[in-house]
């Protein structure tokens, strides 16, 4: 019997690397997808390639998008500064419709691969407040996926799996370490340099550092 397949969104960060390890532990044959979408730096794409190689995924695909042509986010528009202090409401690092776009392309690849499970590393506990990281979004996208695809209407339902949804960052770190994830390969910083070193000041850096500290595990992050 063929091993079950899964498509996994892999950003190169801590969360998505953990999800790959979780899927592999569940017996999935893993296909990872990253996006060159006009983000501020290429460090996370380099990290995604390292993680995919280190974890031995079946195939790692990088899709080119031009979300910086739309702008509207500090991650895609160089005229908007990345904040270095917590903010109220949805932060300027939110990229309009990003997870909707990413999941749509992952859905297309999953249908081609005859995979029925798509994993995403969104989290609604220790997170930045993005609307497309909430459980309601994941559930709604799954319903849409099964209405919008040939496989879905033929009864071969897709599942959108978000195993980190209700975990704290410390719990995520502990789970990943238990599964052998090498977090030194990952990059979480919104404004990392070309060598993958982190600023230590942005929201993503803060959440990552707090997660390792709360987990009681040494943080392998390099800073500039």
Swiss-Prot record:
Domain of life of the organism encoding this protein: Bacteria
EC primary class: ligase
Known cofactor(s): Zn(2+)
Pfam families given in the database record: QueC (PF06508)
Enzyme Commission no: 6.3.4.20
Keywords, sorted A to Z: ATP-binding, Ligase, Metal-binding, Nucleotide-binding, Queuosine biosynthesis, Zinc
Pathway note: Purine metabolism; 7-cyano-7-deazaguanine biosynthesis
Residues that hold ATP according to the record: 10-20
Co-factor note (free text): Binds 1 zinc ion per subunit.
BP terms from Gene Ontology: queuosine biosynthetic process
GO molecular function: ATP binding; ligase activity, forming carbon-nitrogen bonds; zinc ion binding
Catalytic activity: 7-carboxy-7-deazaguanine + NH4(+) + ATP = 7-cyano-7-deazaguanine + ADP + phosphate + H2O + H(+)
UniProt binding sites for Zn(2+): 189, 199, 202, 205
Stretches that traverse the bilayer: none
HAMAP family associated with the record: QueC
Protein family according to the UniProt entry: Belongs to the QueC family.
Stated role: Catalyzes the ATP-dependent conversion of 7-carboxy-7-deazaguanine (CDG) to 7-cyano-7-deazaguanine (preQ(0)).
Protein's recorded name: 7-cyano-7-deazaguanine synthase
């Amino acid at each position: 019997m063929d091993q079950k397949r899964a498509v996994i969104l892999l950003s190169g960060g801590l969360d998505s690397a953990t999800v790959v390890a979780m899927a592999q532990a569940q017996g999935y044959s893993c296909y990872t997808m990253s996006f060159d979408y006009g983000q501020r730096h290429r460090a996370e794409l380099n990290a995604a390639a390292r993680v995919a190689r280190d974890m031995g995924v079946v195939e790692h695909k990088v899709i080119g998008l031009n979300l910086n042509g739309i702008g509207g986010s500090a991650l895609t528009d160089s005229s908007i500064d990345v904040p270095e202090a917590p903010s109220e409401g949805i932060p300027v690092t939110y990229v309009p419709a990003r997870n909707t776009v990413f999941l749509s392309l992952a859905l297309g690849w999953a249908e081609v691969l005859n995979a029925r499970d798509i994993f995403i590393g969104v989290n609604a506990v220790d997170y930045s407040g993005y609307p497309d990281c909430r459980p309601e979004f994941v559930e709604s996208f799954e319903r849409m996926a099964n209405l919008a695809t040939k496989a879905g209407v033929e009864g071969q339902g897709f599942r959108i799996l978000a195993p980190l949804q209700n975990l704290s960052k410390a719990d995520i770190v502990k789970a990943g370490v238990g599964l052998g994830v090498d977090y030194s390969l990952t990059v979480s910083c919104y404004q990392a340099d070309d060598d993958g070193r982190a600023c230590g000041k942005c929201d993503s850096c803060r959440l990552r550092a707090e997660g390792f500290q709360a987990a009681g595990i040494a943080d392998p992050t390099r800073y500039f």
